[in-house]
Amino acid sequence: MTTITQKYEEAKEKYASIDVDTEAVLEKMADVKISMHVWQGDDVRGFLSEDELSGGISVTGNYPGVARSPQQLRQDLEKAFSLIPGKHKLNLHAIYLDTEERVDLNELEPKHFEPWVTWAKENGLGLDFNPTFFSHPMYRDGFTLAHPNPQVRDFWIEHGKRSRRIAEYFGRELGQVAVNNFWVPDGFKDNPVDRLTPRKRLMASLDEIFSEEIDPAYTVDAMESKLFGIGSEAYTVGSHEFYMGYGLTRNKLICLDAGHFHPTEVISNKLSSLSLFGEGMLLHVSRPVRWDSDHVVIMDDELQEIAKELVRNDLLGKTHVGLDFFDATINRVAAWVIGTRNTQKALMKAMLEPTNVLKEAELIGDFTTRLALTEELKDFPFADIWNYYCQENHVPIGLDWLTDVQEYEKVILPTRQLPTGKDSCRFS
């Protein structure tokens, strides 16, 4: 018996004393798929064009070794997934096409993503998708689907339609439902006079996109709101209220991004209410630092509260958990590993709570037991369960994964040269 296994057996007994079955927790963890986002790997560049980022998005940093091709990106992704327990999904944006053809966003077809599907099959992964409504010449005056010019709207409507066909292709080929998430940056920098008309245009554009029947067995649509962005500080067309109304009346998933609300708001407090009314939920787990900064996810209070809400209320079955952060100041493979493993840790920690005992205490008004038990749980040997889970999934335990990443950085990343005059420091 290894030391890891021995510690697990001891921890198993400890948790059994409070009616927690660690074996059942490990089985549940095996069913949790995290949708890891591709754009951390290349600073949201993609392979459609060399245009700079726009749409209120910024990436800072110039850490060496950034992926410059789909092949390099997949190489980095394979390294990251090899250090993360379980089988998961990869979340693609439309700008991550892999083709020799020169095509625009309104011309994309499933064939332009065939290499990704082949790779996903080889690695036992699912794929999710996102139409890309930013960093493009047709992103005009801060608007896309809500632009007053019908020609601009038509371009983006066609892109939205094609994205749904691509997502359906992913689901059909891989046997896993592909979530297709819609986020548009449309908005005004300064105070508008007319807040209603742009929202009418956005609603009409979305209705046109979704007019085509797509098999929900293969793909489902999600709608993502945002409080503000760079260049849309005063008004965002796709607000939380807009997409709550739209999603609930059109049977779409509602996407909650941890950084897309006021700094004093938390999405953990929204999950229970939304679960009562919606078809389902998509989460973009992120870490906002004073604004939607998309820092790498850490094991902070809000991440743990999100996990508790999902587990305590049995919401994992109707919630798709995705990540959304990008940091070019650190090793990009390490960023993926840290963020994904932390999200898994938070979910496991929530599963190791005696939820039924706590709910019963709360129901009868025994708040003393509720407080005492939740506090004592903080000293329980959660790490021993996590380490055993990693051991059983044949991935590094503790900081051992960092040694792998550092070796990868020494051997692989130096072979990648930045184009002359370019770096990874991008602002918009």
Curated annotation (Swiss-Prot):
Q: Name one GO biological process term.
A: rhamnose catabolic process
At the top level, the lineage of the source is Bacteria
One GO MF term: manganese ion binding
Which keywords has UniProt assigned to this entry? Cytoplasm, Isomerase, Manganese, Metal-binding, Rhamnose metabolism
Record-listed E.C. numbers: 5.3.1.14
Entry keyword Metal-binding: yes
Q: Where is the protein found, in the record's own terms?
A: Cytoplasm
Please provide one cellular component term from the Gene Ontology annotations of this protein.
Answer: cytoplasm
Q: How is the cofactor bound?
A: Binds 1 Mn(2+) ion per subunit.
Pfam families reported in the protein's UniProt record: RhaA
Pathway assignment reads: Carbohydrate degradation; L-rhamnose degradation; glycerone phosphate from L-rhamnose: step 1/3
Q: Which InterPro entries match?
A: L-rhamnose_isomerase (IPR050337), Rhamnose_isomerase (IPR009308), Xyl_isomerase-like_sf (IPR036237)
Reaction(s) catalyzed by this protein?
Answer: L-rhamnopyranose = L-rhamnulose
Q: Which residues bind Mn(2+)?
A: H260, D292, D294
Q: Which cofactor does it need?
A: Mn(2+)
Mainly resides where? cytoplasm
UniProt KW Transmembrane keyword: no
**Could you tell me which PANTHER family the record lists for this protein?**
L-RHAMNOSE ISOMERASE
- HAMAP family the record matches: RhaA
> Function, please?
Catalyzes the interconversion of L-rhamnose and L-rhamnulose.
According to its UniProt record, which protein family does this protein belong to?
A: Belongs to the rhamnose isomerase family.
The identity of this protein, by name, is L-rhamnose isomerase
Identify the species of origin.
Answer: Enterococcus faecalis (strain ATCC 700802 / V583)
